[in-house]
Amino acid sequence: MSRTYKASGINLKTQVLGESDKIVTILTPEFGLIRAVAPGARKHNSSLGGRSGMFVVNELLIAKGRSLDKITQAQTLKTYPGLAKDLGKLAASQYLAEIVLSQALSEQPQEELYELFNEHLHRLEALSNANASGVLAHLAHGVFHLLALAGVTPQVQICCLSGRSLKPDFTEPNWQIGFSVPTGGTICLEAWKRLRTEGKGEINNQYPIPHIPLPMPHAQTVVVHRQEIPLISSRLGAMELALLQHLSQPEIMQIDGARDHNWLSVEQILRQYAQYQLGRPIRSATLIDSYFAANHDATI
């Protein structure tokens, strides 16, 4: 059996190893996630220095190792230099990479995930610089598509309680819909309030306050099965719901009237949902928070 193999892949994460090496986590379409040592990558003028950078796509020759494989040759196929020139684009790219790292499998083909991630990096890079709203929109689009590929798309077309289709009502300024992360999507607030009212009434009927608090050794245990009242994680208006409902499309739909704060709400809803599904926080999201806080301050 050959001790070397070829793979093409994009660098998702790097770690320092020793005085001059790096450990690179690479997403490949052929073998999924690979962790390999880039020997001497931190040395001045190393041939692997630039090739081991973030979001560089390489054709690799890799030697198998006992615990870690080793990159012996690398030829760069593609880079995304525009991402590093804009903090918002870079933060959004790292955010998406973190989700990919949580989803990707090792020793299994990951072609769809590889192609999808590269496509969304390309779209982010193509944005004009200092386009805060565009970065948020493309980030939300990418997160939604990654969740869809993993089979955990949030439900945004119907109410998770009643099953009725939901349509944003732009004629009512105070119109709102609920979003429940544990339940998996959107909830009509009228249905939710009705369930709460019915639940309280049912509890009062099933468990009346006893008139005489005497012990009842032979009393039977009554088990009551009722629909759980879901936790409302967020409330969103008509614009936020409209934006969420369009994220499943291949391209971002331009909706008149959408503002930065609408996209921020959508991103934060998807962030909560993705973190719940992944079972871990998205650390790069703090960079997005810092970037847009700074942009907001600069525009006041």
Swiss-Prot record:
Cellular component GO terms held in the UniProt record: bacterial nucleoid
GO biological process annotation, one example: DNA recombination
Superkingdom classification of source: Bacteria
Pfam families: RecO_C, RecO_N
Keywords recorded for this protein, A-Z: DNA damage, DNA recombination, DNA repair
HAMAP family (alphabetical): RecO (MF_00201)
Function: Involved in DNA repair and RecF pathway recombination.
PANTHER family referenced in this protein's UniProt entry, alphabetically: DNA REPAIR PROTEIN RECO
Similarity annotation: Belongs to the RecO family.
Protein name (record): DNA repair protein RecO
Organism: Nostoc punctiforme (strain ATCC 29133 / PCC 73102)
Annotated gene: recO
